Structures are given as C-alpha cells and as structure tokens.
C-alpha cells in the first residue's frame, strides 16, 4: 500500500447513537491538507484488492441469453455481482455485499471482517448483507454508507438493526458518513466521495492512492480534488455503446480515468455486451484493464 494509505492524523468516530440507531460520523479533516487530505508519511502498508465480482445486476451469463459471452467457457467471461475485498496484513474491508456474497467468499480465508463499505442501496450491492452472519462470530461488523443508504438498509433489513436482536441475526453497527470525512478502519484510511448514479447520490471510496467507484454516471467537478493523486482507479463501465441513464459506458470511463490521471484503471460492473474478455481487452488503451472475478491487484 502506498504511503498515503496510512495517515498521521487520527480520526475519531462519534459513537453517539441517534434515535434511529444509526451512528453518525462527525466530519474530520486534517489541517492544511489538499483535496484528499492524505498524509505524506514515509510509512508503507502493503495491501491487496480482490475483485469478488465484476458484473452488473444481471451478472454474466445472463439468464436466458445465448450470446457468445454468456456461452463462453472462459472463466474471465463469467461475472458475479460487483463487490471487492481490500486487505492489509491487519485489516479486511468489504466494498458492497450483493446477492452473490456467500459464493464469492467461499474461496477466501475465513477471517474477521473489520468493515463493510456500501456504495448505495440497490439490491445488487446490498442483497447479501444477511450472509455476513458467520463473520459476526468473530466480532461485530461496522457498516458505513451515506445517510440515505443507512436509512434504506434499516428499512430493507429491519431485523439486522432492531433494538433487540433475536439470536442468529448479523451483529452490525451502522455508521452514516458525511462526504469527504476521513475514517480509519484498522490501518486503512477511507474517504467517501460523492458520485451521481443517474439522479441518485451515492458514494465512491478513496483509500490512499486507490479509488473505487461503481455505478457512476457523472461526478461533479467539485469532487475531483478529492481524487487528486490517485494512481489506481477502479470504475464502472457498462458496455461500449448505447448510452445508459445511470451508468457510464467504456469510452466515458476511459475519459474519466484520463481526467483523474490514474496510472492504471480497472473497469468493473460490466455487462455481457462488453464482448468476450480477451477481445474486449485488446480494444482498450494502455493502462486500462477489464477487471474479472478473482483478480487480485497490489495497491
């Protein structure tokens, strides 16, 4: 992990419970910092990002589809719903837990989950939240999202956030994050940034020189300073053609990567309309890669 991954500044969570049972996180910013506010400490913390899933809400293959991608025997062409695992030697953080979460985690070592970051409330990003139950045997799990997503989680999964939990339900602590606040999960520093999923405000997340953004259609220019210095970008790219009202296409993702100035970019949240993985990768410019399920990258 880059030096920016560890901050010299300590960020404290406001642990005061609100009447809704959602713990709010007070915004905290380092003094004198730039847009991202990351430390230039010389400390290093190695980390790995594993793509647990790289597909859209339908996954790939798509039920009922007989296109060459959906019939492909190449494992790179099979995509579970989008999710990722960020790990250092001490800390494990999940980004989104869709309906394939159980299947995605079976090949992974069974170790404590220190935090769960949710980008937004859509089912393909939260439908597997009940499947974190086994990990709660290792300790409660802190869940982080924007305020609207926290409200949606309480509405959609009320039994997980009731005042009096019955035996066997996940033990989750829900935290509403303000945009651009800095939090520390173990030795991982996290900064949420605002993204527009069509008309829906959602979160992308920055971790030092890594940024993870999915389901984006647009981003306000005011958010760009919070991505300054990002070297590895993960961003959604639905397909090559036919504009979508709430997701960007591959050409838009490539242009966004150039605006950010990322050294390398991995495209995720991909449909079968991207085409066969090997052929589609050849169409991409240098430094832009199609992510695939199970891919691990050092960050």
Features from the language model and the residues they span:
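Cap/insert and terminal regions of metallo-dependent hydrolase folds
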Residues: 218-299
């Amino acid at each position: 992990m880059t030096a920016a991954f560890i901050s010299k500044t300590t960020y404290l969570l406001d642990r005061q419970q609100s009447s809704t049972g959602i713990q709010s996180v007070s915004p905290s910013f380092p003094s004198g910092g730039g847009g991202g506010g990351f430390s230039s400490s010389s400390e290093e913390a190695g980390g790995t990002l594993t793509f647990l899933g790289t597909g859209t809400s339908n996954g790939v293959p798509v039920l009922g589809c007989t296109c060459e991608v959906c019939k492909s025997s190449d494992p790179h062409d099979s995509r579970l719903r989008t999710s990722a695992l960020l790990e250092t030697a001490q800390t494990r953080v999940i980004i989104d837990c869709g309906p394939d979460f159980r299947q995605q985690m079976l090949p992974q070592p069974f170790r404590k989950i220190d935090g769960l970051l949710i980008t937004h409330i859509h089912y393909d990003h939260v439908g597997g939240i009940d499947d974190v139950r086994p990990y709660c045997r290792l300790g409660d799990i802190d869940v982080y999202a924007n305020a609207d997503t926290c409200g949606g989680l309480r509405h959609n999964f009320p039994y997980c956030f009731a005042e009096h939990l019955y035996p066997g339900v996940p033990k989750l602590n829900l935290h509403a994050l303000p945009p651009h606040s800095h939090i520390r999960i173990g030795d991982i520093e996290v900064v949420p940034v605002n993204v527009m999923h069509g008309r829906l405000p959602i979160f992308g997340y920055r971790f030092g020189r890594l940024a993870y953004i999915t389901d984006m259609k647009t981003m306000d220019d005011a958010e760009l300073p919070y991505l300054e210095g990002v070297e590895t970008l993960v961003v959604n790219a639905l397909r090559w053609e036919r504009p979508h009202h709430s997701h960007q296409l591959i050409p838009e993702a490539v242009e966004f990567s150039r605006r950010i100035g990322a050294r390398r970019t991995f495209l995720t949240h991909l449909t079968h309309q991207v085409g066969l993985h090997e052929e589609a990768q050849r169409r991409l410019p240098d430094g832009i890669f199609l992510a695939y399920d199970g891919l691990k990258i050092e960050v």
